[in-house]
């Protein structure tokens, strides 16, 4: 009797991990050439969209407004607002290099923040608070500043649930990301999908700016910023180059095993069809750089390597292996930047005439 009892399982954690290990995805990536890859991408992309919940049926006017312009020494920082939906405003910082000439149009990059204080972190804004200074330094977080100093125009928005858009009133100290997901699910909405929508509206906004070459847009981000970069680049082909830092992994690794995710990172039902490697494969043949720290406790490096092999397969099928760069560095959960900045300069230089590929 006792031996029979010990063979039973009542752990939900083990139950879900077993389901993950035994699952047979309905849309595995097996494409070996360009035509097969395109066909697979169309099928898998449709399933990713399904997992993002109900989205607006059409785009509303942006109604852009610049509410502040600050001299930051080597660049201008504008505080801008625009509508992603009729009743939803996106607050963002637009960083403009001071050497931008009259009539010049440059490449622009969407700098996606991770968990923390939203757009302030990637722009290096600490408000004099020690914990912000420490967190920004530890994660090498202000990549929006690095990019504007490299000559790019940079847009850094607050995603829904973060920064000025943080959800208040989570009862009993519950995780606000999880509460946001639960509230959204009551309406058939998904905060990841809504943020992807807002990311698309960010690209729309950049394309209205006279300083921006609307055909040369990029996207970068660390952690949840990597989530946003991955999904936005996978779903919107206006993203011509992407840098995903400390996010690409497997759901079996960082999510089901470690529980290192939250309610704004959930493409519902995705494991029926594939995993994050397959989502990243949707970006091929556009240039993609993936950063991963060997000492990142939240994203096991062995699981990242599994996902990277899926991505490599896609770029081989696209005859574009030179457009995928994997930077595995000695470090933890942080923006690396040593290879990715050179990658951006190669595939999406600030000035069109500087492209070297």
Where are these regions (language model features)?
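C-terminal catalytic histidine-bearing segment of alpha/beta-hydrolase fold enzymes
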Residues: 309-357
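Cap/lid segment of the alpha/beta-hydrolase catalytic domain
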Residues: 104, 110-197, 207-208, 253-257
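Glycine-rich active-site/cofactor-binding loop and its immediate structural neighborhood
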Residues: 69-130
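N-terminal targeting or regulatory segments adjacent to alpha/beta-hydrolase or S9 domains
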Residues: 1-76, 84, 353-357
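Mobile cap/lid helix-loop segments that gate and shape the active-site cleft of serine hydrolases
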Residues: 179-186, 194, 201, 239-281, ...
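Short beta-strand/loop motif that positions the catalytic acidic residue
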Residues: 283, 290-292
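Glycine-rich nucleophile elbow surrounding the catalytic serine of serine-hydrolase chemistry
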Residues: 221-231
